[in-house]
Amino acid sequence: MSSTDPKALLPDSLAARVSTLTIKEGRAIAIVDAAGLGQQERDDIERAITDILGQREEVSETRVVMTAERTQRRIIAVGSGKGGVGKSTLAANLAIALQRSGHKVGLVDADIYGPSQPLILDTQDAKPEARDSKLIPVESRFGVPVLSMGHLAKPGQAIAWRGPMAGNALSQLIDAHWGETDILIVDLPPGTGDVQLTMLQKFKPAGAVLVSTPQDLALIDAVRAGHLFDQASVPVIGLVENMAGYVCPHCGEVSDPFGAGGVEAAATKLDLPFLGRIPLALEIREGGDAGDPPAAGDGIHAKSFAAIAEKLSRW
């Protein structure tokens, strides 16, 4: 390092983080590349630079400016054309599986009228705080921050709002302090109403995952949801077949109460990727009700969610 470079005043460990250091008329300004640093590390670097430069006779004032590249956050919508197909369970478990694979993942419960993520992620008693008029997501014990109307409304309170109010609520949940989150999973309500339109218009997703059971009625509605994303030029990442086969815990026999293979066949017909199957399993239902999603464990169902999450990571 040149002796005329003010960065020579700093030890190499600090100088490596300083992109620019100027000293003029007694005022020192250090521009620090803070990408990837936590708040404590940033504070330590600022203190060290201030202390070192403060000992110089030619420096009467020091200002340290932290800069970092803005996180390129992808919004992935999880949707279906109808309720009761396990969309919220899939969204929560995919968020956890993606987090375990190394992503920084946040989860928005966009089902304004029937929020379920606080129960699934065991955050029912948490209340989000606000900073600068924006909500701060609730931290779950699975490493996935989450925001839901269930965190804001009283337990059991019915949300009787017209469409514009629901759309405004969604905006507050998405436009929150998500920090360095690189993937934001949005658990959409069933159907193709105001909440979906608000999201597509204001927070256009990078892609969408469609969830359906194998039965024909659910598939018809899933295809309808797919058309909505097509009209908004949002690519459909693929389809997931949920409740795909029930394994009897006593005899091990597999039955198909909702049919079998319908979603994969629909994906082929629509020329869309088939992302995988999630079985109709008591453990998955019990885990969701108990706030202990199976994707957080190491069982066979965790592997099913991890396999789908891996395909999302590669997309």
Language-model-detected regions and their locations in the chain:
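Residue-level signature of catalytic and energy-coupling elements of molecular machines
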Residues: 18, 53, 72, 83, ...
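Inter-motif core of Ras-like GTPase G domains
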Residues: 176-178, 196-217
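Switch II (G3) loop of P-loop NTPases
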Residues: 149-165, 169-198
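C-terminal lobe/tail of nucleotide-utilizing enzymes
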Residues: 2-7, 15, 34-37, 43-47, ...
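Short glycine/serine/threonine-rich phosphate/pyrophosphate-binding segments
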Residues: 84-93, 115-116, 188-196, 218-221
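Phosphate-binding loop that captures ATP/GTP phosphates
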Residues: 98-160, 167, 174
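Walker A/P-loop phosphate-binding motif and the immediately C-terminal alpha-helix
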Residues: 74-109, 226
